[in-house]
Amino acid sequence: MIVSAQPRPTGHPGYSETLPCLEESAEVARKLVRTALAAWHLHELADTGTLLVSELVANAVKHTNSRLIRVVISRPSERNVRIGVVDKSRTMPEITKSNGEELLLGGRGLVLMDAVTERWGTDLYRWGKQVWGELRCEEAV
């Protein structure tokens, strides 16, 4: 696996890694998120960031037929951290209304993401999509 760190217009490097589309990749994705947040001195976002990337990886594994996914962590602004997962599916994620029992059995990934992020969205590409969530930094670094 190759991890890349690319400079961005905000002056903070972005981090990304291509991983197999498997449940086991969530552990590597969490380590990448912790590494990026530590580099930016944003340790307070580590728990939420790792929870977010775990849900994004789980959704890609469950809802796509992709062989590979790409985990992307960036700073679109001084105040935000964006964590995303890119896959080859063009199916857009939706928050579905369901009863509490259904949520206990699964299907809470997007509900959880909606609760812990400042905002989230999907960037659709010709060949797939990126689902991402943004976390708000308490203080600009």
Describe the role of every protein-language-model region.
Residues S16-V28:
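STAS-typified acidic loop motif
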Residues E27-S54:
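Conserved short strand/loop->alpha-helix "switch" segment adjacent to the catalytic nucleotide/phosphoryl-transfer site
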Residues L19, L37, L52, L56, ...:
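Generic leucine side-chain signal with a strong bias for well-ordered alpha-helical environments
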Residues M1-S16, V61-V141:
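Conserved beta-strand-loop-beta-strand hairpin that lines the nucleotide-binding pocket
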Residues T48-S66:
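Histidine-centered phosphotransfer motif of kinases
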Residues C21, L37, H41-E44, V61, ...:
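Short coil/turn residues that cap or connect secondary-structure elements
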